[in-house]
Amino acid sequence: MLYPIGIQDFESIRRNGYVYVDKTALIYRLATTGRYYFLSRPRRFGKSLLVSMMEAYFSGKKDLFEGLAVSGMEKDWTVYPVLRFDLSGEDYSRPDVLDAVLSRCLKKWEDLYGVPERSSTLSSRFKDVIEAAVAKTGRPAVVLIDEYDKPIVDTLWDENLSETVRVQLQGFYGVMKAMDGSIRFGFLTGVSKLGKLSVFSGLNNLKDISMDARYSDICGISEKELRKNFADSVKELAHANGLTEKECFAKLTEMYDGYHFCEKSEGVYNPFSLLNTLDSLHFRKYWVSTGTPSFLVKSLIQGNYRLAEMESLQVPESVLSGVYSRKPDVISLLYQTGYLTIVGYNPATERYTLGYPNKEVEDGFTDTLSEYFTPVRDNWSELSADKFVEDIRRGDVQMLMRRFTAFFADMDYRIQGKAELYFQNTMYVMLKLLGQQVAVERHTSNGRIDILVQTDRYVYIIELKRDRDPQDALDQIDEKGYDWPFLAGDRKVFKIGASFSSATRRLENWSVAE
């Protein structure tokens, strides 16, 4: 089987025999029930292939759709002039790049449709191209814009350039509304909606299908599609890894499934990781390894977020919809870029629960955070990690705390922010890296445990204090009864009070009680 890894051209996939998961029935529904749409999905989720397929459909290339669902639905196969803008391939952090990209696209169509004289502005040129396309073909135009937000994301940390880009795109996209009578269909995709309100203020007739249950699997691969299209591939993967087919499906689900884009939808697989796994016959972090955007980590750290909350975060729909015009909200960005997904919904409060979609994302994001929260010398990873794990498994709490002390003393302090949160986040990331069952701010009937680590033999209750005696932390554990839920079991409970210095950002002292 040929897997279209990195291939985003629909015609190439169909003509060269690559496997294609049929999404054409959904495109027919869009084309026959509305005119202007917006879709947000994470990177490498098949958005560009979707747009390419739309381009082929509206170009009337009937032969490419033979055997697909739409071949039995579409009767006319009308050829429309298609104007497709792909904004994904450039770095817009430099001035004038956006001008050059848009101008290059427009010039192609100006030559094709014979625009007699070029206007001075990009917006005017776009308008002239639409008019010329309609005049020459006698049919309304189709406008497809792939990765509308790439110029915005690339300039987030340059306020002046970001504002210039926003104003420019606002005027450019607004042409679609002004030329409504000359447009048959419009479709825009992107990773995020961080500029949706301000950039699209001139184009307020877009229907956002990002959280529409009818289109929840328009990108990505569902469980049903996996079993229908890749049954033999999964058998081969199972054999190569010494697994039964049932075990192999379960591991694929654990690693790459779990994306939900509305409150009532089946999970979908990350197509990039899934196809790479089936092709290479190895389970790896393919999607995460392509790079976590640095602006996400910067936003998370600067926002003083408690990292453990990323595993189960309660938010209103406005966060998922990205109703933030200029200043991006980091939780909204983490959801829209695929690092968090919907894992629950409470209709009474109308709040969504967000969490990591799968093991690949959770482990990979922890690895990325470790570069910021554990930036110590190489001897940490090479010499000490296994020893931390052994200390935890053996219940050697004194040695464990000595290692923590040495760890913080050896750190390169690049992280700023609230001291208590800094220590808590750092210990959380460390313990997650070590593969431990760790909870932060674990709720009890009388309060919240700062850090809770559990193994099959031991329970570690860690209370952190800044610039105070560690005995104060132990007293709080006793007064609040943090150990009560574990006293009836067979596991040994360690109560640890740890004191950090806000001046040196080191673990200064600790006390242990059993």
Task: Tell me the role of every PLM-derived stretch.
Residues F172-M179, S332-L340, Y428-L433, Q476-I496:
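Metal-dependent nuclease catalytic cores in nucleic-acid-processing enzymes
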Residues E163-V167, R466-D483:
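Mg2+/Mn2+-dependent nuclease catalytic core
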Residues P485, G489-E514:
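Domain-level recognition of nuclease-like catalytic cores that cleave nucleotide substrates
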